[in-house]
Amino acid sequence: MPTATVPLRIIQITDLHLKTKPSQLWGVDVDASLNAVLAHIQGRNPAPDFIIATGDLVGDEPEAYGRLRELLEPLGVPVYCLPGNHDFPAVMGQVLRSGSMRWERHLVFDNWQLVLLDSSFPGTPVGHLARRELALLDTALAVHPDLHTLVCLHHSPLPVGTTWLDTMTVVNGEALFAILERYPRVQAVVWGHIHAEFTGRRGNIQLFATPATSVQFNPDAPEPKVDELPPGYRWFELYPDGTLKTGVERPEPATRLIAA
């Protein structure tokens, strides 16, 4: 954990789309790509303090959470999980809350706090933040206004410039930013869902989307199109003075499969 000079080190993984058996998604071997990412994470030195898994952890099969545990627990660090539109929050809350798998939504450290928001909305790929989620955020920021803050969710809270993806943002994203913009120590918001990397800014708040561990989408295409980039993940270093460093790693090789 951070000291005066050592940062809090976090890994974000997202959009695993794991099934109960090895599978493909848009021609990508989901298991092989995830294993490549996890092997890369295990090789990091220094190791992360914990991992944030920001949704679409399984591909519409609630039984796959057992496999997810088996793959993530060997990492040896806590894994905090959020649901996406392909997940089952009630099942997640039962299966992913023991051992290294965690279900806490508000994490407080010496100089930083993380707030994990559930943006899933049953039956649709669109995101929505329920009143309880906005209240969780507002309370955390009001109670700890002195802490630097990183907010995590699954869906994009605002358009990212990709026509088809921008139909699936958080529909009440402005309500989110109305809260965030009242607190000057909110440093960044990070999400997944778009299967691509994104970096932006809204006022003083940094914005990051993280590539999937599975298939990658071309953010410049007007309709869904697979990108040939390898799977990826994001790392964060959060320093006591509020400095935030981040980057994306894409383990080689790419794992796109050619259909027989």
Language model: regions and residue ranges:
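Binuclear metal-dependent phosphoesterase catalytic core
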Residues: 4, 28-31, 35, 179, ...
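Active-site-proximal beta-strand elements of phosphoester/diester hydrolases
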Residues: 7-20, 111-120, 150-152, 205-211, ...
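Active-site metal-binding loops of divalent metal-dependent hydrolases
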Residues: 14-17, 55-57, 85-86, 119-120, ...
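A short, structured active-site edge motif that brings together acidic residues
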Residues: 79-90
